[in-house]
């Protein structure tokens, strides 16, 4: 899992509709959390069944992502940056694991990375290889650009009976909150079996270079389109 960020990623995969682009960030978040940001890309693909080549990549990754490597994972710069950010927003990273640490636990618990579908397998590969936090949405349910902001007083959230607590950091489009940052996705906006276009979002925190986000999005897109 050596991280090689000095090289630019290869050309865009076919069917990836645009190069990763930065999303918007609410001014109050930019002031409170320097380095916080979101990058997105959209591709003409949905979940579907993973081809054998993608399953083989998961098997190879399982062999490399084990033992001592998984144990020392949190000490690496990118996972550590997310752990620091978790503490800043009131999450204990020893109780609420960062995405890559959750994958490490799943790998050790299951004995391997289990193949689930094209999207989940692609996200597993990208998150495990680079360490960047990724989220996926049904592109047809996204209105405009994605960004990060604080929830408003009494703001509704699909799938939740009560409003979001005010001041919750959310991933949002230009109309509504789509997900709690590092938390639950609103009902009906995540990737589903019928999804044909997927928007991938990479979350940047202080200490995570932009090139790492671009690499993670490229890896996930390439795997989905393989």
Language-model regions, residue ranges each:
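Charge-biased, low-complexity intrinsically disordered regions
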Residues: 2-226
């Amino acid at each position: 899992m050596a991280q090689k960020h000095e090289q630019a990623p290869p050309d865009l995969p076919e069917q990836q509709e645009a190069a990763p682009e930065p999303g918007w960030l609410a001014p109050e978040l930019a002031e409170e959390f320097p380095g916080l940001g979101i990058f997105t890309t959209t591709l003409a693909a949905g979940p579907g069944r993973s081809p054998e080549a993608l399953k083989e990549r998961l098997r190879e990754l399982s062999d490399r992502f084990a033992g001592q490597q998984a144990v020392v994972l949190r000490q690496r710069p990118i996972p550590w940056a997310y752990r620091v950010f978790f503490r800043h927003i009131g999450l204990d990273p020893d109780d609420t694991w960062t995405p890559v640490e959750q994958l490490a636990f799943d790998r050790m618990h299951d004995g391997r990375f289990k193949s689930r579908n094209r999207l989940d397998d692609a996200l597993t590969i990208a998150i495990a290889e680079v360490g960047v936090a990724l989220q996926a949405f049904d592109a047809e349910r996204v209105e405009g650009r994605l960004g990060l902001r604080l929830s408003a007083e009494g703001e509704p959230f699909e799938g939740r009976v009560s409003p979001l607590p005010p001041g919750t950091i959310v991933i949002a489009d230009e109309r509504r909150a789509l997900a709690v940052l590092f938390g639950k996705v609103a009902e009906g906006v995540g990737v589903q079996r019928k999804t044909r276009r997927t928007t991938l979002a990479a979350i940047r925190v202080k200490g995570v270079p932009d090139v790492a986000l671009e690499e993670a999005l490229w890896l996930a897109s390439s795997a989905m389109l393989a």
